């Protein structure tokens, strides 16, 4: 269900704005997207796992809030990120 630490480190390295950057919206959104995809795969097999479904909805809501923040803060960074992640917006 959860992503491995090595996968998370690769995502952080790819989207970080500087060394040691784990808190920028881009990094947080990219990590949440990977976690959402992993949970989505889990739920496609385990359809009755309602606890994981609730966790998925919370992660989606958190990502939505971060995307809205980034869109209001810097539209070019927002557009670059959704293009890189392949999100629908």
UniProtKB/Swiss-Prot annotation:
Classification via CDD domains: Ribosomal_S15p_S13e
InterPro entries: Ribosomal_uS15 (IPR000589), Ribosomal_uS15_bac-type (IPR005290), uS15_NS1_RNA-bd_sf (IPR009068)
Pfam families: Ribosomal_S15 (PF00312)
GO molecular function terms noted in the UniProt entry: rRNA binding; structural constituent of ribosome
Tagged with keyword rRNA-binding: yes
GO cellular component: cytosolic small ribosomal subunit
Assigned keywords, A-Z: Ribonucleoprotein, Ribosomal protein, RNA-binding, rRNA-binding
Recorded superkingdom: Bacteria
GO biological process, one term: translation
Stated role: One of the primary rRNA binding proteins, it binds directly to 16S rRNA where it helps nucleate assembly of the platform of the 30S subunit by binding and bridging several RNA helices of the 16S rRNA.
Quaternary structure and partners: Part of the 30S ribosomal subunit. Forms a bridge to the 50S subunit in the 70S ribosome, contacting the 23S rRNA.
Family, similarity comment: Belongs to the universal ribosomal protein uS15 family.
The name this protein goes by in its record: Small ribosomal subunit protein uS15
Species of the source: Lacticaseibacillus paracasei (strain ATCC 334 / BCRC 17002 / CCUG 31169 / CIP 107868 / KCTC 3260 / NRRL B-441)
Gene (UniProt): rpsO
